[in-house]
């Protein structure tokens, strides 16, 4: 039992210390790490919500949703990233904010589809 508890306590402590570090990043690398972690979580949430909405739709509506999602991804990437000779630059705050807005949009579509029916034009946005 002691062999299990100690690693769990160490893991919990390191996660708590890391979480506190994200509240007040010490330098640019900490900020990039924290922003990246936040974006990754938002991206996972987005994928879950997209799948939830998609499962509730008929095939034609799924195609419309996919078209809208791909267009949105292109828009997010164009707005929040830049390609230069040195490589790619991504504004993670921009990407996270846009992703959170998209999650809210998809949740609205999910509520709409389950209550009054889907509006195809909105699915394609």
What are these regions (language model features)?
Residues 10-11, 83:
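Short, linear, compositionally biased motifs with a strong N-terminal bias
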Residues 18-125:
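N-terminal alpha-helical modules
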Residues 2-8:
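Sec-dependent signal peptide recognition
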Residues 12-17:
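N-terminal signal peptide c-region/cleavage motif recognized by signal peptidases
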């Amino acid at each position: 039992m002691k062999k299990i508890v100690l690693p769990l306590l160490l893991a919990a402590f390191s996660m708590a210390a890391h979480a506190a570090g994200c509240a007040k990043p010490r330098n640019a690398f900490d900020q990039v790490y924290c922003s990246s972690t936040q974006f990754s979580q938002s991206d996972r949430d987005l994928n879950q919500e997209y799948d939830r909405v998609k499962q509730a739709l008929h095939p034609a509506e799924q195609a419309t949703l996919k078209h809208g999602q791909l267009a949105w991804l292109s828009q997010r990437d164009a707005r929040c990233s830049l390609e230069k000779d040195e490589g790619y630059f991504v504004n993670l705050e921009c990407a996270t904010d846009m992703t959170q807005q998209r999650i809210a949009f998809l949740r609205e579509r999910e509520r709409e589809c389950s209550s009054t029916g889907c509006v195809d034009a909105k699915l394609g946005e």
